[in-house]
C-alpha cells in the first residue's frame, strides 16, 4: 500500500488531486497558428498536483480533436472553449475558476 507524500493518506483515499482541482484558476483562450488554424489553449494547470498528460488525453477524446501538452499548458486543435469549460467542470474543476477569454 502506497502512502501519499502530501497528505499522508493511502493513495486510494488521497484527496490532494480533488482539492487542487477546486483551487486552481484556469485560463482558456484561442490563438491563430500557421495557415490560419485555430488552437484552444488551457493554461494555469499545476503539473505537480494534476496529471497533465491524462487530462490532455481526456480532453482530446471528449472534444474529438488532436492536441498536446507543452510547457505546462494544453493545446487543442480547433475552437473548443465552451466544450472545454463543460468537460473541466464535469471533472471537478470549479466553473468559477475557469476563465474564458
Curated annotation (Swiss-Prot):
Task: Cite the Gene3D superfamilies for this sequence.
Answer: SUI1-like domain
The GO biological-process annotations, alphabetized, read as:
formation of translation preinitiation complex; regulation of translation; translation reinitiation
The terms under GO molecular function for this entry are:
mRNA binding; translation initiation factor activity
Which PANTHER family does the annotation name?
DENSITY-REGULATED PROTEIN, DENSITY-REGULATED PROTEIN HOMOLOG
Family statement drawn from the similarity comment of this UniProt entry: Belongs to the SUI1 family.
Alphabetically ordered keywords of this record:
Protein biosynthesis, Translation regulation
Check the record and name the InterPro entries matching this protein.
DENR/SUI1_TIF, SUI1, SUI1_arc, SUI1_arc_bac, SUI1_dom_sf
Protein name, please? Protein translation factor SUI1 homolog
